[in-house]
Regions:
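N-terminal glycine-/serine-/threonine-rich phosphate-binding loop
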Residues: 57-61, 86, 90-92, 100-103
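N-terminal secretory signal peptides and thylakoid transit peptides that target proteins
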Residues: 6-33
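A short, well-structured edge-of-sheet supersecondary motif
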Residues: 71-95, 311-312
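Conserved serine DD-peptidase/penicillin-binding transpeptidase domain
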Residues: 41-72, 117-368
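A short acidic/small-residue loop/turn micro-motif
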Residues: 34-40, 98-100
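Short active-site loop at a secondary-structure junction
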Residues: 78, 94-114, 118
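A common structural microfeature
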Residues: 79-81, 106, 126, 143
Length: 368
């Protein structure tokens, strides 16, 4: 199908100040019970209201676990600092505010400077659709090629817009094959082999990337089984994909397991870890074919019939025989860098480094 489109848990208060207050209050009432009863007997009815007095404002906050208690429970022996603020920016609680610590993912700042220096702030990634022949009666007389430049921000909606450009040209199909070209950058299996394989921030890299090379896995409990869904969702388009499959297995650990293949990412998940339902992103190990499958889906949905995507071994040239029929430009590099630093996006950082090195005349084949 194609779709065009915390709660806060309160800690136990058994040992909280609120509970101690209640017990002490109860003890006081018991000790003074006789006097209280005598006074109550002679008091007018209006003074013997069954409604309790209101609690003071902010009393519920006493039941919350403080940050200091959390640090103590975790037995953290190193330098710990934090700051908790509300929506207005008011600091509610802080620890070690004067401790100088390096920011997270500090290497991304260096990568940003490197990319801006060698690519320029106005640099854009361009994704193209190229035809190897003329259009006759709505059909390209030859092949169609989806050519990537490494754009780390390309998503399913951008592919949908590319397909829309084909529609605007009156293209309804092709007589040849449909290829995906991801040769602008080397194919790198995983960003960091020391990280968990199923972490969505640890995908593969190629010259054609999509949705940060992640696939959306969703599950819902249906009786004794689960309904599973794998899709390439963005804001407008969310096509189901077959490039990644999932099965539920009876095991403890690992929660997720992956088997690499030439035509499909085969995943399995522990049944005991699923609960009643949920969703999460998983990394894609076949990004070029992933992008190709999604492009076929969004194109078919708009009336452009394309066959299954195939790899291209050599980069498609810009010649008369390879005519550009659709094109998508990313945002300027300055905006891409800003987004990367805000969300600490690993894929973007690595691609910027590879692309900047290529602009210098280097030919990096890995991340080291």
């Amino acid at each position: 199908t194609l779709r065009m489109t915390d709660p806060r848990s309160t800690p136990s208060t058994l040992s909280s100040p609120v509970s101690r207050l209640s017990r002490r209050a109860a003890l006081g009432l018991m000790l003074g019970g006789g006097a209280s009863a005598a006074i109550a007997q002679g008091a007018p009815a209006v003074m013997r209201s069954p409604l309790p007095l209101p609690r003071p404002d902010g009393l519920h906050k006493l039941s919350y676990t403080s940050g200091a208690e959390l640090v103590e429970r975790a037995r953290l022996t190193g330098a710990v600092s934090y700051a908790v603020a509300d929506d207005t920016g008011k600091i509610l609680e802080a620890r070690g505010v004067d401790v100088a610590l390096p920011p997270a993912s500090v290497a991304k700042a260096v990568t940003s400077i490197y990319a801006l220096e060698h690519l320029g702030g106005d640099f854009v990634f361009t994704t193209k659709v190229m035809a190897t022949g003329p259009v006759v009666d709505g059909k390209v007389q030859g092949d169609l090629i989806l050519v990537g430049s490494g754009d780390p921000t390309l998503d399913s909606d951008a592919l949908g817009a590319l397909a829309g450009q084909l529609v605007a040209l009156g293209i309804t199909g092709i007589t040849g094959a449909f290829y995906v070209d991801g040769t602008a950058l080397p194919q790198i299996e995983i960003i960091d082999d020391q990280q968990t394989e199923f972490a969505s921030y640890n995908p593969s890299i190629s010259g054609l990337n999509l949705n940060y090379n992640r696939v959306y896995f969703e599950w819902k409990k249906e009786g004794d089984t689960f309904a599973l869904k794998m899709d390439a969702r963005a804001r407008k388009f969310a096509p189901d994909v077959r490039i990644a499959s999932m099965s539920v297995v009876d095991r403890g650990l690992p929660v997720f397991d992956h088997e690499a293949g030439n035509a499909q990412d085969v995943w399995s998940v522990s049944r005991s870890a699923l609960g009643k339902g949920g969703a999460r992103w998983l990394p894609v190990r076949l990004p070029r074919l992933y992008a190709g499958e999604v492009f076929v889906a969004v194109a078919n949905a708009q009336g452009v019939e394309l066959p299954q995507a195939l790899h291209i071994a050599k980069r498609a040239p810009d010649t008369a025989e390879h005519r550009i029929v659709a094109q998508h430009d990313s945002q300027a590099l300055t905006k891409i860098v800003k987004h990367m630093l805000k969300y600490s996006t690993n894929l973007t950082a690595e691609i910027l480094g590879l692309t900047a090195s290529g602009a210098r005349g280097l030919d990096p084949q890995d991340l080291y």
